[in-house]
């Protein structure tokens, strides 16, 4: 498309979304559930065709030299599609929060004042790589009574088109407007610039992808932005802790899957347990091919681990989101230094402490400035599905409006409602 056509095309998407948003907002819980269950069924019925479309994206990605983590994020396996279907079903079974009134109270004047939860209206979603985000965003849009415009990465265009077609079918089956969820069908990057500059039609933009993408959108957008920044997640092994449990959790947090933003990228270890803990986790990482970039003190312990891939950490390593079998390792004096290190280098996504000390755990929960803070659990649990939110639109590292996994409530706002019986202000 030429520039003029891109402007006209995105404008039409905005107009159609705005019209559809009114009908989406009025939809009953039963109608929205019908659409979600239809989408779950269609996903299961179309696993093979979806994988055929996905294969074209994967072949193109490999030919274009995309990194292994990026290719992994592109892959639509039967397990990934089943998780998407289950997310739709979980959302369908959840209570509908739209229209609920909270905090209703009687005022001295006689009026009653409360707040009603309502859809945002239209949100734009810009994301890279993961085609399953198309389903996560669409299903949350349906459940929350919003319309949305989705712009996936060019590397996943065939997969996204196929998934968006299923969403349109599910909406039609439920009697909802097919324009309630729209996919930007062009890979022209100018479409992104137009989408983030349509305040008359788009109420909020949610970018999900690399740091460069999110910084660009945050800088150029003319509508509010809910940011999903990178995930430099930390696991801190405290003194005292259950060493066996700590080894198990630190292993899972790093090696369960390397490409998600909730994988741990930095391992902090209290000096008092380092000599016992590091050789055990080091042996596991070595066996799985994980490179350990450590401080001099940690390397002195890890050098005895057979087959260990070791390197001295640089200052940049403490801030790095690897999305790969690499982890930075640092020995700290204790919980004070761990908290200070995390608050300095973390991306404020998800950080965990593994400890037997209740006071250390409470301090960590209070003082670590991240969207999700965990005690004795893997950072890999930082996920809307695991948190019982159904699907998630992303994990916000912002402090306003939505923070952490953004589910249904993150796609709503509250308006004041006032109920009276003829009261007038004196």
From Swiss-Prot:
Pathway: Amino-acid biosynthesis; L-proline biosynthesis; L-glutamate 5-semialdehyde from L-glutamate: step 2/2. It is found in: Cytoplasm. The keyword NAD does not apply. Its main location: cytoplasm. It is an enzyme of class 1 (oxidoreductase). Keywords: Amino-acid biosynthesis, Cytoplasm, NADP, Oxidoreductase, Proline biosynthesis. It holds the Pfam family Aldedh. One of its GO terms (cellular component) is cytoplasm. One of its GO terms (biological process) is L-proline biosynthetic process. The keyword Oxidoreductase applies. PANTHER family: DELTA-1-PYRROLINE-5-CARBOXYLATE SYNTHASE (PTHR11063:SF8), GLUTAMATE SEMIALDEHYDE DEHYDROGENASE (PTHR11063). This is Gamma-glutamyl phosphate reductase. It comes from Delftia acidovorans (strain DSM 14801 / SPH-1). The lineage of its organism: Bacteria, Pseudomonadati, Pseudomonadota, Betaproteobacteria, Burkholderiales.
């Amino acid at each position: 498309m030429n520039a003029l056509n891109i402007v006209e095309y995105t404008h039409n998407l905005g107009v159609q979304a705005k019209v559809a948003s009114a009908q989406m907002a009025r939809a009953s819980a039963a109608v929205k559930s019908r659409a979600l269950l239809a989408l779950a069924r269609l996903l299961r019925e179309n696993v093979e065709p979806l994988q055929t479309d996905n294969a074209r994206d994967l072949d193109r990605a490999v030919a274009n030299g995309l990194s292994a983590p990026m290719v992994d994020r592109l892959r639509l396996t039967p397990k990934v599609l089943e998780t998407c279907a289950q997310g739709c079903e979980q959302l369908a079974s959840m209570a509908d929060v739209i229209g609920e009134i909270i905090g209703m109270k009687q005022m001295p004047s006689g009026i009653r004042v409360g707040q009603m939860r309502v859809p945002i209206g239209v949100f734009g979603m810009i994301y890279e790589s993961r085609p399953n985000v198309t389903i996560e965003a669409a299903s949350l849009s349906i459940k929350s009574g919003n319309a949305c415009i989705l712009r996936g990465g060019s590397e996943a265009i065939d997969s996204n088109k196929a998934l968006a077609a299923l969403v349109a079918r599910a909406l039609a089956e439920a009697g909802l407007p097919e324009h309630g969820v729209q996919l930007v069908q062009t890979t022209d990057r100018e479409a992104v610039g137009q989408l983030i500059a349509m305040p008359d039609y788009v109420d909020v933009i949610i970018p999900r992808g690399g740091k460069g993408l999110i910084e660009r959108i945050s800088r150029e957008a003319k509508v509010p932005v809910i940011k999903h920044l990178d995930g430099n997640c930390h696991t801190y092994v405290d003194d005292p802790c259950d060493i066996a449990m700590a080894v198990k959790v630190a292993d899972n947090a790093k090696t369960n899957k390397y490409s998600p933003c909730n994988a741990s990228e930095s391992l902090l270890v209290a000096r008092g347990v380092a000599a016992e803990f590091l050789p055990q986790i080091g042996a596991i990482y070595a066996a799985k091919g994980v490179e350990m970039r450590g401080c001099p003190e940690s390397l002195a312990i890890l050098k005895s681990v057979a087959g260990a891939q070791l390197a001295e950490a640089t200052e940049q390593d403490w801030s790095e989101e690897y999305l790969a079998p690499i982890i930075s390792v640092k020995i700290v004096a204790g919980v004070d230094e761990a908290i200070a290190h995390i608050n300095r280098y973390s991306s404020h996504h998800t950080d965990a402490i593994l400890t037997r000390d209740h006071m250390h755990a409470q301090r960590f929960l209070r003082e670590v400035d991240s969207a999700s803070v965990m005690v004795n659990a893997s950072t890999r649990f930082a996920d809307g599905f695991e948190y019982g939110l159904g699907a998630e639109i992303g994990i916000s590292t912002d402090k306003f409006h939505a923070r952490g996994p953004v589910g249904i409530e993150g796609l709503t706002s509250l308006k004041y409602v006032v109920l009276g019986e003829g009261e007038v202000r004196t």
